[in-house]
Design a protein with these regions (language model features):
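Conserved polar catalytic motif of the HATPase_c/GHKL fold
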Residues: 13-24, 80
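Glycine-rich ATP-binding loops of the HATPase_c
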Residues: 89-99
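A short, flexible helix-to-loop-to-beta junction within the catalytic ATP-binding CA
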Residues: 23-31
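Conserved short strand/loop->alpha-helix "switch" segment adjacent to the catalytic nucleotide/phosphoryl-transfer site
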Residues: 1-14
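Detector for a conserved hydrophobic position within an alpha-helical segment of the HATPase_c
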Residues: 85-86
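Glycine-rich/acidic phosphate-handling loop/turn and adjacent ATP-lid/helix
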Residues: 46-79
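Glycine-rich nucleotide-binding loop
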Residues: 58, 97-104
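Short beta-strand/loop element within the Bergerat-fold HATPase_c
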Residues: 34-46
Length: 111
C-alpha cells in the first residue's frame, strides 16, 4: 500500500523505466553472474523511497542536469521519471559507484 497515492501511470513510468534501463544495462554484461538488479521500496520518516540498483562495470558520468551524459541508462526516459517524482513533490537522483548504478525516487508519503 506504500504507493497507493500514486496514479497507475505514475507507477508504470517510475518502475517500468527504471527496470527497462537496468535490464538494458545488465544485458550487455558478458559475465552472467554479474547480471544483477536489486529493487527496494520502503517508507521512512514520512517518505517513500523507491531504489533501483544494477551492476554496471563502466562508469556512468552524469551531466549538470543529473542525467547520464551519454545515451546510457535511458537519459531521455529518466526525464519522465524525474517529472513524475517532482509532480508529487519528490526527487529523483542517480549515482554510480564501485560498479553499481543507482536510481532513487524519494516521495513524500501520503496518508
Amino acid at each position: 500500500h506504500l504507493l497507493d497515492f500514486l496514479e497507475t501511470g505514475e507507477i508504470c513510468t517510475i518502475v517500468g523505466t527504471a527496470l527497462d534501463n537496468a535490464t538494458e544495462s545488465v544485458e550487455t554484461e558478458p559475465d552472467h553472474e554479474k547480471r544483477l538488479i536489486r529493487v527496494a521500496v520502503y517508507a521512512q520518516n514520512g517518505f517513500v523511497m523507491l531504489r533501483f540498483e544494477n551492476y554496471c562495470a563502466q562508469e556512468v558520468e552524469l551531466g549538470a542536469d543529473g542525467l547520464p551524459r551519454r545515451n546510457t541508462h535511458g537519459g531521455s526516459d529518466l526525464r519522465s521519471v524525474r517529472a513524475a517524482a517532482e509532480k508529487r513533490g519528490g526527487t529523483m537522483t542517480l549515482h554510480w559507484e564501485n560498479g553499481w548504478f543507482t536510481l532513487r525516487v524519494l516521495l513524500p508519503q501520503k496518508s
